């Protein structure tokens, strides 16, 4: 991949959810947003040669991008086998696993990418995803969340407890949320993208 735009074009081929499940708060990560996040990590040296995981991966857009950017290994985890089956054809080197990331045992991971449930159906699930990712990642976590000052304050505080500093990768993005049974086919929700980076002091002690 020579550019973020080239990566975006490649990621646009990753399938969407055929039958999105509202109870899982499944929302597609748009190719342009995924490319921005992945390219940011790539420029920081956090993909090539690294072990990457996508928590709640859906059809696997982050793992597909990580493959293209030279990750050593990609782990694609989701509870929804339908979504995993849809994405398998586009994943050449990823370990695709049906599991609940909140309870499944995980080995060493360098960087986690995720577009987790926002917590509108199951309150607090976004926080559970984040704490799980922070507990597993050796270097960084890139995560998409609803844009909210209160949420940002909470997540920055949680990150510090785990020894991570917080950076904003994308300040505001209007993410399309599409469910076939909605009267209005596409809704837009404001989201932010955070990078939680383990502090150098913590890394040096591990």
Q: Model-found features: residue ranges?
A:
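Conserved short alpha-helix immediately C-terminal to the canonical SAM/SAH-binding motif I
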Residues: 82-83, 151
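Conserved SAM-binding loop of SAM-dependent methyltransferases across substrates and taxa
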Residues: 59-71
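Conserved SAM-binding loop
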Residues: 87-88
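Conserved S-adenosyl-L-methionine
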Residues: 56
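S-adenosyl-L-methionine
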Residues: 1-53, 62
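Conserved SAM-binding strand-loop segment of SAM-dependent methyltransferases
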Residues: 92-101
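Conserved SAM-binding motif I beta-strand of class I
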Residues: 73-78
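S-adenosylmethionine
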Residues: 101-192
């Amino acid at each position: 991949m020579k550019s973020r735009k080239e990566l975006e074009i490649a990621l646009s081929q990753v399938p969407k959810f055929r039958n999105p499940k509202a109870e899982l708060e499944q929302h597609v990560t748009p190719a342009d947003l995924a490319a921005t996040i992945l390219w940011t990590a790539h420029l920081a040296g956090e993909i090539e040669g690294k072990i990457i995981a996508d928590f709640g991966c859906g059809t696997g857009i982050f793992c597909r991008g990580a493959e293209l950017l030279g990750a050593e290994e990609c782990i694609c985890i989701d509870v929804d086998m339908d979504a995993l089956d849809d994405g398998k054809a586009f994943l050449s080197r990823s370990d695709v696993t049906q599991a609940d990331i909140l309870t499944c045992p995980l080995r060493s991971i360098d960087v986690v990418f995720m577009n987790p449930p926002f917590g509108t159906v199951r309150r607090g699930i976004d926080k559970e995803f984040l704490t799980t990712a922070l507990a597993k990642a050796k270097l960084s976590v890139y995560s998409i969340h609803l844009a909210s000052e209160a949420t940002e304050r909470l997540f920055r505080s949680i990150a510090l407890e785990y020894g991570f500093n917080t950076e904003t990768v994308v300040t505001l993005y209007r993410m399309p949320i599409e469910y076939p049974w909605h009267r209005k086919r596409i809704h837009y929700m404001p989201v932010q993208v955070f990078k939680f980076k383990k502090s150098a002091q913590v890394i040096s002690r591990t």
